[in-house]
């Protein structure tokens, strides 16, 4: 039996050109999804970065190296627009993809939004013993994903730590 890890330490990263531009201009940032995830997961790290593959990969490396977290949750950049590169960036570095997350997330999303769920490219994977989730930028999608994340992250970590 795998031990379910408790007291999980999270980092939350919002990927959005517009929110990042507001941040660097000193404007108020309207990041409902990132703030929801930060609050619900009691995240120890929270940041906003632009839609840029190198920045996405770099922030993963930075968080893994300098912060004691078990899980990094990205929101934004998972759509089908040209600038949506979160999934592509993460797929370049993750060691194992957790395909079941995408399947379950799409099923739950379909129950809420119908066929529009097919536009979601949410994903999860493992990198250096950490779980990485990539979620859409919408608040409703993040709420849906939180059901899965809160329920299963401790179980996944138990498997990872068992070796």
UniProtKB/Swiss-Prot annotation:
Keywords: ATP-binding, Molybdenum cofactor biosynthesis, Nucleotide-binding, Transferase. The keyword Transferase applies. One of its GO terms (molecular function) is molybdopterin adenylyltransferase activity. Its EC number is 2.7.7.75. It catalyses: molybdopterin + ATP + H(+) = adenylyl-molybdopterin + diphosphate. InterPro entries: MoaB, MoaB/Mog-like_dom_sf, MoaB/Mog_dom, MoCF_biosynth_CS. It is an enzyme of class 2 (transferase). It comes from the Archaea. One of its GO terms (cellular component) is cytosol. Pathway: Cofactor biosynthesis; molybdopterin biosynthesis. The keyword Hydrolase does not apply. One of its GO terms (biological process) is Mo-molybdopterin cofactor biosynthetic process. Belongs to the MoaB/Mog family. Catalyzes the adenylation of molybdopterin as part of the biosynthesis of the molybdenum-cofactor. This is Probable molybdopterin adenylyltransferase. It comes from Methanocaldococcus jannaschii (strain ATCC 43067 / DSM 2661 / JAL-1 / JCM 10045 / NBRC 100440). The gene is moaB.
